[in-house]
Protein backbone atom coordinates (compact mmCIF):
# COMPACT_ATOMS: atom_id res chain seq x y z
CA UNK A 1 0.00 0.00 0.00
CA UNK A 2 1.10 3.58 -0.53
CA UNK A 3 1.50 4.47 3.07
CA UNK A 4 4.46 5.89 4.91
CA UNK A 5 6.12 7.47 7.82
CA UNK A 6 6.73 11.00 8.97
CA UNK A 7 10.39 12.00 9.09
CA UNK A 8 11.51 15.34 10.52
CA UNK A 9 14.95 14.50 11.92
CA UNK A 10 13.65 13.55 15.32
CA UNK A 11 12.42 17.05 16.14
CA UNK A 12 9.13 17.87 17.78
CA UNK A 13 7.74 21.40 17.74
CA UNK A 14 7.68 23.00 21.16
CA UNK A 15 4.61 25.13 20.65
CA UNK A 16 1.23 24.62 19.06
CA UNK A 17 2.01 26.39 15.83
CA UNK A 18 4.35 25.69 12.97
CA UNK A 19 5.70 28.30 10.60
CA UNK A 20 5.68 26.91 7.09
CA UNK A 21 5.63 27.79 3.43
CA UNK A 22 2.14 28.32 2.13
CA UNK A 23 1.21 27.28 -1.37
CA UNK A 24 1.91 30.80 -2.62
CA UNK A 25 5.44 30.62 -1.27
CA UNK A 26 4.89 33.08 1.60
CA UNK A 27 5.38 32.35 5.29
CA UNK A 28 2.18 31.37 7.06
CA UNK A 29 1.28 30.03 10.47
CA UNK A 30 -0.64 26.79 10.75
CA UNK A 31 -1.97 25.88 14.16
CA UNK A 32 -1.55 22.33 15.44
CA UNK A 33 -1.69 20.58 18.80
CA UNK A 34 0.72 18.17 20.49
CA UNK A 35 -2.01 16.08 22.15
CA UNK A 36 -5.33 14.64 21.04
CA UNK A 37 -6.95 12.34 23.56
CA UNK A 38 -5.79 9.57 23.88
CA UNK A 39 -2.57 10.20 21.90
CA UNK A 40 0.33 12.62 21.94
CA UNK A 41 3.25 13.42 19.65
CA UNK A 42 6.69 12.53 20.99
CA UNK A 43 10.31 12.34 19.81
CA UNK A 44 10.83 8.72 18.69
CA UNK A 45 14.61 8.86 18.33
CA UNK A 46 16.01 8.19 14.87
CA UNK A 47 12.50 7.43 13.60
CA UNK A 48 11.57 11.11 13.94
CA UNK A 49 8.24 11.93 15.47
CA UNK A 50 5.84 9.28 16.64
CA UNK A 51 2.55 8.86 18.48
CA UNK A 52 2.04 7.23 21.86
CA UNK A 53 -1.03 6.65 23.98
CA UNK A 54 -1.78 8.66 27.09
CA UNK A 55 -3.93 5.92 28.59
CA UNK A 56 -4.19 2.14 28.36
CA UNK A 57 -5.98 0.71 25.32
CA UNK A 58 -7.55 -2.72 24.84
CA UNK A 59 -7.94 -4.97 21.80
CA UNK A 60 -10.49 -3.51 19.39
CA UNK A 61 -10.41 0.00 20.85
CA UNK A 62 -10.44 2.82 18.30
CA UNK A 63 -7.36 4.85 19.22
CA UNK A 64 -8.43 7.63 16.89
CA UNK A 65 -10.39 8.18 13.70
CA UNK A 66 -9.49 10.65 10.98
CA UNK A 67 -11.33 11.87 7.93
CA UNK A 68 -9.21 12.18 4.81
CA UNK A 69 -7.60 15.55 4.16
CA UNK A 70 -8.22 14.68 0.52
CA UNK A 71 -8.89 11.47 -1.40
CA UNK A 72 -9.51 10.35 -4.99
CA UNK A 73 -10.67 7.23 -6.82
CA UNK A 74 -8.09 5.43 -8.98
CA UNK A 75 -8.27 6.29 -12.69
CA UNK A 76 -8.92 2.67 -13.65
CA UNK A 77 -12.01 2.45 -11.41
CA UNK A 78 -13.46 5.93 -11.86
CA UNK A 79 -16.56 4.54 -13.63
CA UNK A 80 -17.28 1.83 -11.06
CA UNK A 81 -16.62 3.38 -7.65
CA UNK A 82 -18.49 6.17 -5.85
CA UNK A 83 -16.24 9.25 -5.66
CA UNK A 84 -17.75 10.11 -2.28
CA UNK A 85 -17.94 6.94 -0.15
CA UNK A 86 -15.66 4.73 -2.33
CA UNK A 87 -18.22 1.93 -2.51
CA UNK A 88 -18.39 -0.12 -5.71
CA UNK A 89 -21.65 0.39 -7.60
CA UNK A 90 -23.20 -1.49 -10.52
CA UNK A 91 -25.07 1.57 -11.86
CA UNK A 92 -23.54 4.72 -10.38
CA UNK A 93 -24.94 8.21 -10.92
CA UNK A 94 -22.71 10.41 -13.12
CA UNK A 95 -21.96 14.08 -12.55
CA UNK A 96 -23.82 15.82 -15.38
CA UNK A 97 -21.30 18.66 -15.58
CA UNK A 98 -17.81 17.12 -15.76
CA UNK A 99 -19.05 13.65 -16.78
CA UNK A 100 -16.10 12.16 -14.88
CA UNK A 101 -17.20 11.70 -11.27
CA UNK A 102 -19.68 8.96 -10.33
CA UNK A 103 -21.73 8.52 -7.16
CA UNK A 104 -24.04 6.02 -5.48
CA UNK A 105 -26.89 8.50 -5.73
CA UNK A 106 -27.64 12.19 -5.29
CA UNK A 107 -27.11 11.91 -1.53
CA UNK A 108 -23.47 10.93 -2.05
CA UNK A 109 -23.13 13.54 -4.79
CA UNK A 110 -24.34 16.31 -2.48
CA UNK A 111 -22.02 15.12 0.28
CA UNK A 112 -19.05 15.29 -2.12
CA UNK A 113 -19.87 18.60 -3.78
CA UNK A 114 -17.70 20.72 -1.49
CA UNK A 115 -14.66 18.63 -2.53
CA UNK A 116 -15.70 18.19 -6.15
CA UNK A 117 -16.91 21.62 -7.26
CA UNK A 118 -13.51 23.11 -8.15
CA UNK A 119 -12.35 19.81 -9.59
CA UNK A 120 -15.54 19.67 -11.65
CA UNK A 121 -14.88 23.09 -13.15
CA UNK A 122 -11.23 22.29 -13.90
CA UNK A 123 -12.07 19.00 -15.64
CA UNK A 124 -14.73 20.69 -17.76
CA UNK A 125 -12.28 23.36 -18.84
CA UNK A 126 -9.51 21.01 -20.05
CA UNK A 127 -11.93 18.39 -21.34
CA UNK A 128 -10.58 15.39 -19.43
CA UNK A 129 -9.45 14.35 -15.96
CA UNK A 130 -5.72 14.07 -15.19
CA UNK A 131 -4.24 11.06 -13.37
CA UNK A 132 -5.06 10.31 -9.74
CA UNK A 133 -1.84 11.83 -8.36
CA UNK A 134 -2.52 15.16 -10.06
CA UNK A 135 -6.15 15.11 -8.94
CA UNK A 136 -5.12 14.35 -5.35
CA UNK A 137 -2.53 17.15 -5.20
CA UNK A 138 -5.09 19.59 -6.61
CA UNK A 139 -7.67 18.54 -4.02
CA UNK A 140 -5.07 18.96 -1.27
CA UNK A 141 -4.26 22.49 -2.44
CA UNK A 142 -7.90 23.51 -2.73
CA UNK A 143 -8.41 22.22 0.80
CA UNK A 144 -5.36 24.15 2.08
CA UNK A 145 -6.58 27.37 0.48
CA UNK A 146 -10.08 26.86 1.86
CA UNK A 147 -8.87 26.12 5.41
CA UNK A 148 -6.25 28.90 5.68
CA UNK A 149 -6.32 30.39 9.16
CA UNK A 150 -8.52 27.68 10.65
CA UNK A 151 -7.42 25.95 13.85
CA UNK A 152 -8.32 22.34 14.61
CA UNK A 153 -7.96 20.67 18.00
CA UNK A 154 -7.49 17.37 16.14
CA UNK A 155 -4.59 18.40 13.90
CA UNK A 156 -1.30 16.95 15.13
CA UNK A 157 0.83 17.88 12.12
CA UNK A 158 0.76 19.87 8.91
CA UNK A 159 1.40 18.79 5.36
CA UNK A 160 4.39 21.12 5.29
CA UNK A 161 6.07 19.04 8.01
CA UNK A 162 5.54 15.70 6.31
CA UNK A 163 8.70 14.40 4.66
CA UNK A 164 8.69 14.21 0.86
CA UNK A 165 11.99 12.27 0.43
CA UNK A 166 12.66 14.12 -2.82
CA UNK A 167 16.40 14.14 -2.08
CA UNK A 168 16.38 10.33 -1.85
CA UNK A 169 14.43 9.62 -5.03
CA UNK A 170 16.11 7.95 -7.99
CA UNK A 171 16.61 9.97 -11.20
CA UNK A 172 13.85 7.91 -12.85
CA UNK A 173 11.37 8.64 -10.05
CA UNK A 174 12.24 12.35 -10.10
CA UNK A 175 11.68 12.43 -13.85
CA UNK A 176 8.21 10.92 -13.40
CA UNK A 177 7.47 13.41 -10.64
CA UNK A 178 8.41 16.34 -12.89
CA UNK A 179 6.00 15.04 -15.53
CA UNK A 180 3.23 14.98 -12.92
CA UNK A 181 4.13 18.54 -11.88
CA UNK A 182 3.78 19.70 -15.49
CA UNK A 183 0.42 17.92 -15.81
CA UNK A 184 -0.65 19.63 -12.60
CA UNK A 185 0.00 23.09 -14.02
CA UNK A 186 -1.92 22.20 -17.17
CA UNK A 187 -4.84 21.26 -14.91
CA UNK A 188 -4.63 23.96 -12.20
CA UNK A 189 -7.15 26.75 -13.01
CA UNK A 190 -5.74 30.22 -13.59
CA UNK A 191 -8.44 31.64 -11.33
CA UNK A 192 -7.10 29.62 -8.39
CA UNK A 193 -4.26 31.01 -6.30
CA UNK A 194 -0.81 30.52 -7.87
CA UNK A 195 1.28 27.71 -6.42
CA UNK A 196 5.08 27.49 -6.40
CA UNK A 197 6.72 24.55 -8.16
CA UNK A 198 8.75 23.60 -5.07
CA UNK A 199 5.59 23.25 -3.00
CA UNK A 200 3.80 21.25 -5.69
CA UNK A 201 6.81 18.92 -5.92
CA UNK A 202 6.77 18.59 -2.12
CA UNK A 203 3.13 17.48 -2.19
CA UNK A 204 3.78 14.90 -4.89
CA UNK A 205 6.61 13.55 -2.74
CA UNK A 206 4.35 13.48 0.32
CA UNK A 207 1.61 11.43 -1.34
CA UNK A 208 4.22 9.09 -2.81
CA UNK A 209 5.32 7.92 0.65
CA UNK A 210 2.33 8.90 2.81
CA UNK A 211 -0.66 8.13 0.60
CA UNK A 212 -3.02 5.54 2.10
CA UNK A 213 -4.80 3.15 -0.24
CA UNK A 214 -8.57 3.01 0.20
CA UNK A 215 -10.46 -0.26 -0.25
CA UNK A 216 -14.03 -0.92 -1.34
CA UNK A 217 -16.79 -1.67 1.15
CA UNK A 218 -15.87 -5.36 1.38
CA UNK A 219 -12.12 -4.85 1.61
CA UNK A 220 -11.57 -6.90 -1.55
CA UNK A 221 -9.89 -4.32 -3.75
CA UNK A 222 -7.93 -1.08 -3.48
CA UNK A 223 -10.05 1.57 -5.20
CA UNK A 224 -8.41 4.89 -4.36
CA UNK A 225 -5.81 6.83 -2.41
CA UNK A 226 -6.09 9.47 0.29
CA UNK A 227 -3.98 11.53 2.65
CA UNK A 228 -4.49 11.34 6.43
CA UNK A 229 -1.92 13.64 8.12
CA UNK A 230 -2.30 12.40 11.71
CA UNK A 231 -1.99 8.80 10.55
CA UNK A 232 1.34 9.69 8.93
CA UNK A 233 2.78 10.17 12.44
CA UNK A 234 2.29 6.49 13.30
CA UNK A 235 5.60 4.69 12.79
CA UNK A 236 6.17 1.24 11.33
CA UNK A 237 6.74 -2.10 13.00
CA UNK A 238 6.56 -5.46 11.24
CA UNK A 239 4.70 -6.84 14.30
CA UNK A 240 2.56 -3.79 15.17
CA UNK A 241 0.19 -3.07 18.03
CA UNK A 242 -2.40 -1.36 15.79
CA UNK A 243 -4.11 -1.78 12.45
CA UNK A 244 -5.71 0.76 10.12
CA UNK A 245 -9.04 0.17 8.42
CA UNK A 246 -11.20 2.35 6.22
CA UNK A 247 -14.72 3.04 7.44
CA UNK A 248 -16.73 4.17 4.39
CA UNK A 249 -19.10 6.18 6.57
CA UNK A 250 -22.86 6.44 6.21
CA UNK A 251 -24.64 8.66 3.71
CA UNK A 252 -27.80 6.54 3.44
CA UNK A 253 -29.69 7.54 6.59
CA UNK A 254 -32.86 9.51 5.87
CA UNK A 255 -31.96 11.95 8.64
CA UNK A 256 -28.81 13.82 7.55
CA UNK A 257 -27.81 14.29 11.20
CA UNK A 258 -26.95 10.58 11.25
CA UNK A 259 -24.62 10.82 8.25
CA UNK A 260 -20.93 10.15 8.91
CA UNK A 261 -17.83 10.85 6.84
CA UNK A 262 -15.46 8.41 5.22
CA UNK A 263 -12.60 7.94 7.67
CA UNK A 264 -9.75 5.71 8.73
CA UNK A 265 -9.79 4.11 12.15
CA UNK A 266 -6.61 3.21 14.03
CA UNK A 267 -7.53 0.17 16.13
CA UNK A 268 -5.60 -1.57 18.89
CA UNK A 269 -4.74 -5.22 18.20
CA UNK A 270 -4.20 -5.98 21.87
CA UNK A 271 -3.42 -4.29 25.16
CA UNK A 272 -1.35 -1.11 24.73
CA UNK A 273 0.07 0.33 27.94
CA UNK A 274 0.01 4.04 28.79
CA UNK A 275 3.02 5.74 27.21
CA UNK A 276 3.61 2.96 24.65
CA UNK A 277 4.30 3.96 21.05
CA UNK A 278 1.63 3.23 18.46
CA UNK A 279 2.79 1.24 15.44
CA UNK A 280 1.33 -0.19 12.26
CA UNK A 281 2.85 -2.26 9.47
CA UNK A 282 3.46 -0.53 6.14
CA UNK A 283 4.04 -3.82 4.29
CA UNK A 284 2.59 -7.32 4.35
CA UNK A 285 4.31 -9.40 7.03
CA UNK A 286 4.37 -12.43 4.72
CA UNK A 287 7.84 -11.68 3.39
CA UNK A 288 11.13 -12.78 4.95
CA UNK A 289 12.83 -10.02 6.95
CA UNK A 290 15.38 -9.04 4.28
CA UNK A 291 12.61 -8.68 1.69
CA UNK A 292 10.49 -6.55 4.04
CA UNK A 293 13.52 -4.36 4.75
CA UNK A 294 14.17 -3.98 1.02
CA UNK A 295 10.55 -3.01 0.34
CA UNK A 296 10.54 -0.48 3.18
CA UNK A 297 13.81 1.07 2.05
CA UNK A 298 12.61 1.26 -1.54
CA UNK A 299 9.19 2.78 -0.81
CA UNK A 300 9.67 4.63 2.47
CA UNK A 301 13.43 5.32 2.57
CA UNK A 302 14.27 3.92 6.01
CA UNK A 303 15.99 0.85 7.42
CA UNK A 304 13.63 -1.25 9.51
CA UNK A 305 15.21 -2.22 12.83
CA UNK A 306 12.18 -3.81 14.46
CA UNK A 307 12.69 -6.98 16.49
CA UNK A 308 11.22 -9.25 13.83
CA UNK A 309 13.63 -7.91 11.20
CA UNK A 310 16.79 -7.73 13.31
CA UNK A 311 16.21 -11.21 14.76
CA UNK A 312 14.70 -12.75 11.62
CA UNK A 313 11.71 -13.96 13.62
CA UNK A 314 9.60 -16.47 11.64
CA UNK A 315 12.00 -16.43 8.68
CA UNK A 316 12.61 -20.12 9.36
CA UNK A 317 8.89 -20.86 9.05
CA UNK A 318 8.53 -18.78 5.88
CA UNK A 319 11.32 -20.78 4.22
CA UNK A 320 10.45 -24.12 5.84
CA UNK A 321 11.18 -27.41 4.07
CA UNK A 322 9.51 -30.74 4.68
CA UNK A 323 11.02 -32.87 7.44
CA UNK A 324 10.11 -36.56 7.07
CA UNK A 325 11.39 -38.62 10.01
CA UNK A 326 14.43 -36.37 10.35
CA UNK A 327 15.19 -36.38 6.63
CA UNK A 328 15.11 -33.07 4.73
CA UNK A 329 15.52 -32.46 0.99
CA UNK A 330 18.98 -31.39 -0.15
CA UNK A 331 19.88 -27.74 -0.70
CA UNK A 332 20.05 -28.35 -4.46
CA UNK A 333 16.53 -29.78 -4.52
CA UNK A 334 15.19 -26.87 -2.43
CA UNK A 335 16.84 -24.36 -4.77
CA UNK A 336 15.48 -26.09 -7.86
CA UNK A 337 11.91 -26.10 -6.52
CA UNK A 338 12.26 -22.52 -5.29
CA UNK A 339 13.37 -21.36 -8.75
CA UNK A 340 10.54 -23.34 -10.33
CA UNK A 341 8.05 -21.73 -7.91
CA UNK A 342 9.20 -18.19 -8.72
CA UNK A 343 8.81 -18.84 -12.44
CA UNK A 344 5.42 -20.47 -11.88
CA UNK A 345 4.14 -17.48 -9.91
CA UNK A 346 5.03 -15.20 -12.84
CA UNK A 347 3.16 -17.49 -15.25
CA UNK A 348 0.19 -17.63 -12.86
CA UNK A 349 -0.04 -13.85 -12.75
CA UNK A 350 0.20 -13.58 -16.54
CA UNK A 351 -2.58 -16.14 -17.04
CA UNK A 352 -4.70 -14.52 -14.36
CA UNK A 353 -4.31 -11.08 -15.93
CA UNK A 354 -5.54 -12.51 -19.24
CA UNK A 355 -8.52 -14.11 -17.48
CA UNK A 356 -7.32 -17.61 -18.37
CA UNK A 357 -8.35 -19.16 -15.07
CA UNK A 358 -8.21 -22.77 -16.22
CA UNK A 359 -4.56 -22.22 -17.12
CA UNK A 360 -4.02 -20.72 -13.65
CA UNK A 361 -5.44 -23.88 -12.06
CA UNK A 362 -3.26 -26.08 -14.27
CA UNK A 363 -0.09 -24.23 -13.27
CA UNK A 364 -1.10 -24.26 -9.59
CA UNK A 365 -1.63 -28.03 -9.62
CA UNK A 366 1.72 -28.60 -11.34
CA UNK A 367 3.41 -26.32 -8.81
CA UNK A 368 1.87 -28.05 -5.81
CA UNK A 369 2.92 -31.43 -7.18
CA UNK A 370 6.54 -30.26 -7.08
CA UNK A 371 6.27 -28.20 -3.87
CA UNK A 372 4.47 -30.64 -1.56
CA UNK A 373 7.35 -33.15 -1.24
CA UNK A 374 9.87 -30.35 -0.59
CA UNK A 375 8.31 -27.38 1.21
CA UNK A 376 6.89 -27.20 4.72
CA UNK A 377 3.33 -26.04 5.33
CA UNK A 378 4.38 -22.47 6.16
CA UNK A 379 6.69 -21.93 3.18
CA UNK A 380 5.70 -18.68 1.44
CA UNK A 381 6.03 -20.08 -2.08
CA UNK A 382 3.65 -22.90 -1.19
CA UNK A 383 1.19 -20.57 0.55
CA UNK A 384 1.04 -18.20 -2.42
CA UNK A 385 0.13 -21.04 -4.75
CA UNK A 386 -2.44 -22.42 -2.29
CA UNK A 387 -4.04 -18.98 -1.96
CA UNK A 388 -4.32 -18.51 -5.71
CA UNK A 389 -5.54 -22.06 -6.31
CA UNK A 390 -8.26 -21.74 -3.68
CA UNK A 391 -9.43 -18.38 -4.99
CA UNK A 392 -9.51 -19.34 -8.66
CA UNK A 393 -11.14 -22.73 -8.06
CA UNK A 394 -13.83 -21.00 -6.00
CA UNK A 395 -14.45 -18.64 -8.89
CA UNK A 396 -14.77 -21.68 -11.17
CA UNK A 397 -17.15 -23.21 -8.58
CA UNK A 398 -14.92 -26.21 -7.93
CA UNK A 399 -15.48 -25.74 -4.22
CA UNK A 400 -14.42 -29.08 -2.77
CA UNK A 401 -10.89 -28.86 -4.14
CA UNK A 402 -10.77 -25.15 -3.32
CA UNK A 403 -11.75 -25.83 0.30
CA UNK A 404 -8.88 -28.26 0.76
CA UNK A 405 -6.36 -25.69 -0.45
CA UNK A 406 -8.01 -22.94 1.60
CA UNK A 407 -7.71 -24.97 4.81
CA UNK A 408 -4.01 -25.60 4.18
CA UNK A 409 -3.52 -21.90 3.49
CA UNK A 410 -5.25 -20.90 6.73
CA UNK A 411 -3.20 -23.43 8.71
CA UNK A 412 -0.02 -21.83 7.36
CA UNK A 413 -1.18 -18.23 7.80
CA UNK A 414 -2.19 -18.89 11.41
CA UNK A 415 1.38 -19.87 12.28
CA UNK A 416 2.83 -16.76 10.63
CA UNK A 417 0.52 -13.79 11.11
CA UNK A 418 -0.22 -11.84 14.28
CA UNK A 419 -3.30 -13.56 15.80
CA UNK A 420 -5.39 -10.43 15.28
CA UNK A 421 -4.08 -9.54 11.82
CA UNK A 422 -6.82 -8.20 9.54
CA UNK A 423 -5.48 -10.05 6.49
CA UNK A 424 -5.57 -13.29 8.46
CA UNK A 425 -9.18 -12.60 9.41
CA UNK A 426 -10.15 -11.91 5.79
CA UNK A 427 -8.37 -15.06 4.59
CA UNK A 428 -10.17 -17.20 7.18
CA UNK A 429 -13.49 -15.60 6.21
CA UNK A 430 -12.97 -16.45 2.54
CA UNK A 431 -11.96 -19.99 3.49
CA UNK A 432 -15.14 -20.31 5.55
CA UNK A 433 -17.30 -19.20 2.62
CA UNK A 434 -15.50 -21.66 0.35
CA UNK A 435 -16.18 -24.50 2.79
CA UNK A 436 -19.84 -23.48 2.97
CA UNK A 437 -20.15 -23.66 -0.81
CA UNK A 438 -18.48 -27.08 -0.69
CA UNK A 439 -21.16 -28.30 1.72
CA UNK A 440 -18.69 -28.68 4.60
CA UNK A 441 -20.92 -26.92 7.09
CA UNK A 442 -19.11 -27.85 10.32
CA UNK A 443 -15.73 -26.66 9.06
CA UNK A 444 -17.36 -23.61 7.46
CA UNK A 445 -18.99 -22.52 10.71
CA UNK A 446 -15.77 -22.97 12.66
CA UNK A 447 -13.82 -20.86 10.18
CA UNK A 448 -16.48 -18.16 10.06
CA UNK A 449 -16.49 -17.91 13.86
CA UNK A 450 -12.68 -17.68 13.91
CA UNK A 451 -12.77 -14.93 11.30
CA UNK A 452 -15.45 -13.04 13.21
CA UNK A 453 -13.36 -13.10 16.39
CA UNK A 454 -10.53 -11.37 14.52
CA UNK A 455 -12.55 -8.89 12.44
CA UNK A 456 -14.60 -7.71 15.42
CA UNK A 457 -11.25 -6.41 16.73
CA UNK A 458 -9.75 -5.13 13.49
CA UNK A 459 -12.90 -3.68 11.91
CA UNK A 460 -15.47 -3.33 14.69
CA UNK A 461 -19.07 -4.50 14.84
CA UNK A 462 -20.47 -1.78 12.57
CA UNK A 463 -18.12 -2.11 9.60
CA UNK A 464 -19.80 -3.45 6.41
CA UNK A 465 -17.41 -6.41 6.30
CA UNK A 466 -18.21 -7.42 9.87
CA UNK A 467 -21.93 -7.00 9.25
CA UNK A 468 -21.68 -9.28 6.21
CA UNK A 469 -19.78 -11.81 8.28
CA UNK A 470 -22.33 -11.70 11.09
CA UNK A 471 -25.07 -12.60 8.60
CA UNK A 472 -22.99 -15.54 7.34
CA UNK A 473 -22.17 -16.61 10.90
CA UNK A 474 -25.84 -16.63 11.88
CA UNK A 475 -26.76 -18.59 8.75
CA UNK A 476 -24.05 -21.24 9.19
CA UNK A 477 -24.97 -21.63 12.86
CA UNK A 478 -28.59 -22.25 11.92
CA UNK A 479 -27.57 -24.67 9.17
CA UNK A 480 -25.23 -26.55 11.49
CA UNK A 481 -28.04 -27.07 14.00
CA UNK A 482 -30.31 -28.32 11.23
CA UNK A 483 -27.55 -30.56 9.85
CA UNK A 484 -27.11 -32.24 13.22
CA UNK A 485 -30.87 -32.76 13.56
CA UNK A 486 -31.64 -34.06 10.08
CA UNK A 487 -28.99 -34.17 7.36
CA UNK A 488 -31.49 -34.98 4.58
CA UNK A 489 -33.67 -31.95 5.36
CA UNK A 490 -30.55 -29.82 5.60
CA UNK A 491 -29.32 -30.89 2.14
CA UNK A 492 -32.70 -30.08 0.63
CA UNK A 493 -32.85 -26.62 2.20
CA UNK A 494 -29.24 -25.96 1.26
CA UNK A 495 -29.99 -26.48 -2.44
CA UNK A 496 -32.84 -23.98 -2.17
CA UNK A 497 -30.58 -21.42 -0.51
CA UNK A 498 -27.82 -21.91 -3.08
CA UNK A 499 -30.22 -21.23 -5.93
CA UNK A 500 -30.80 -17.74 -4.51
CA UNK A 501 -27.07 -17.24 -3.73
CA UNK A 502 -27.58 -15.07 -0.62
CA UNK A 503 -24.00 -15.36 0.59
CA UNK A 504 -20.87 -13.62 -0.67
CA UNK A 505 -19.18 -15.71 -3.35
CA UNK A 506 -15.77 -16.97 -2.28
CA UNK A 507 -14.28 -16.08 -5.66
CA UNK A 508 -15.67 -12.56 -5.76
CA UNK A 509 -12.23 -11.01 -5.53
CA UNK A 510 -11.34 -12.36 -8.95
CA UNK A 511 -14.40 -10.77 -10.48
CA UNK A 512 -13.39 -7.40 -9.10
CA UNK A 513 -9.75 -7.56 -10.04
CA UNK A 514 -9.76 -9.24 -13.43
Where are these regions (language model features)?
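Short alpha-helical interaction motifs and adjacent low-complexity tails used for partner binding
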Residues: 2-514
Amino acid sequence: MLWGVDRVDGKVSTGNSSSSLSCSGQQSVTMTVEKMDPVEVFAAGEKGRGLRVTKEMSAGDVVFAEASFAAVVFDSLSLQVCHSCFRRQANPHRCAQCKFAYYCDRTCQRAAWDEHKQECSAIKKIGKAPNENVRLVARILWRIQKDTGLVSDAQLTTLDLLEDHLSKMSPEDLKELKVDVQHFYNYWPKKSKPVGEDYVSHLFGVINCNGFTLSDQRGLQAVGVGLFPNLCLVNHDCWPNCTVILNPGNQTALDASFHSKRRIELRALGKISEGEELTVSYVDFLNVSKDRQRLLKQQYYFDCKCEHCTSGIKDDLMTAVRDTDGHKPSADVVKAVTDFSLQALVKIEEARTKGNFHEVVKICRESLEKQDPVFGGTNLHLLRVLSTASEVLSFLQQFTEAAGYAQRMVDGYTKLYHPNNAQLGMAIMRAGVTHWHAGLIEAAHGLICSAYAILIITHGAHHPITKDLEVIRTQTEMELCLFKQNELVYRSMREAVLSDKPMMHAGEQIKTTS
